[in-house]
Amino acid sequence: FFGLGADGTVGANKNSIKIIAEETENHGQGYFVYDSKKSGAATVSHLRFGPRPIRSPHLITKATFVACHQPQFIDKFDLLGPAVEGATFLLNTSEPREKAFDSLPLEMQEAMIRKRIRFFVIDAYRVAKDSGMGGRINTVMQTAFFAISGVLPKDEAIAAIKHAIEKTYGKKGEALVRRNFEAVDASLAHLHEVEVPQAPTTTRRRPPVVS
């Protein structure tokens, strides 16, 4: 999960690990990498879960799910490098569904075609703004992850997310909880799968990637 220090991505992923551990038979672990000047700097959250206890934290090199919470990152990082064949890629973008694939640099398009990656998009900032959440897209992206990952049945996942919201924000007032609930429900309506074509649709290459 690629995010920014101020967008709530790390906090949402910590909540996701708790939900997975509490609601399934799986063990979960999070490993978080971010700049010391966290606010405004890139963060990368590595989530692992499975039926056996996970002992040692490390970076994920074979990912079945990759999420980009900030659209500008498509030109800054090799987001799909760790993705395995058949992985799922979730992108926060303001591009309409029919133009989302075209907006990607050539390297990403080629990787998606070669690895047969499933592609989902959501305009998380629009959903957050319309729900009264400002720029905090964490709830929106967390909902999208659970909706398409299959870690939990969707209805169970939504109920678990809302329960976590009540625990996290309940003391801050009913209005904040309600706004988060609205963001969860709106996320499902604004999440779309994009058909990946058989050939690239651009010649635009990504600038040199930041390692």
Regions found by a protein language model. Name each.
Residues 2-211:
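Active-site cofactor/cluster-binding pocket
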